[in-house]
Amino acid sequence: MDNDRYDILIAEIRKLNTALERLAGPAPIESDWTSADCFVWAPGRLYLQPVPKPNRVALTLIRGVDRVRDILHENTQRFAEGFPANNVLLWGARGMGKSSLVKAVHEDVRAASGVSLKLVEVHREDISTLPVLLDLVRDTPHRVIVFCDDLSFDHDDTAY
């Protein structure tokens, strides 16, 4: 093969490589699980963004939801210990403390158990990427709680 044909072949291979990389999308960025206990899912970069100082309140400050708090705490404790746990749906009006309760229970169980329990928040608009997120966290040695804040189902919403 002469040099001209060789150069043309190399150029075509490079074009193919560029097209394949574009189709494949971005490679996942390795998440540093040791950097935080709380993360936010960034699906565009296939990355768990650490939240080093999450906005949360102490569990003892949450009042008026004792039964729900106790059930959620027991379920989270079982999950942290490696036992099966139930999925949870907390519902109520905005501002009632649902997310605060989730974050407070996470911190209380994590601190008391010493288990590497991580909390990952998924934004409502990123729910469709849950399978990708679950693939990324499946092989981690950590116990991972995934939660979506302010999930709502509107009459005209066809995304669900």
Per-segment meaning from a language model:
Residues 2-50:
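Interdomain "pre-motor" coupling segment immediately N-terminal to P-loop NTPase/helicase cores
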Residues 7, 47-71:
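Dynamic helix-loop-helix/coil hinge segments at AAA+ ATPase domain boundaries and subdomain interfaces
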Residues 51-53, 77-85:
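Phosphate-binding P-loop
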Residues 67-81:
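Pre-Walker A adenine-sensing motif
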Residues 68-71, 101, 126-130, 156-159:
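Helical mechanochemical/support elements of P-loop NTPase systems and associated helical scaffolds
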Residues 82-104:
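Walker A/P-loop nucleotide-binding motif
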Residues 108-144, 151-156:
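AAA+/P-loop NTPase substrate/partner-engagement loops
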